Amino acid sequence: GNFFRF
């Protein structure tokens, strides 16, 4: 969880 919503 550090780019879009992963």
Curated annotation (Swiss-Prot):
Modified residues (Phenylalanine amide): F6
Protein location: Secreted
CC annotations in GO: extracellular region
Signal peptide stretch: none
Gene Ontology BP terms: neuropeptide signaling pathway
Record's keyword terms, sorted: Amidation, Neuropeptide, Secreted
Coiled-coil residue windows: none
Keyword Secreted annotated: yes
Family per record: Belongs to the FARP (FMRFamide related peptide) family.
Protein's name according to its UniProt entry: FMRFamide-like neuropeptide GNFFRF-amide
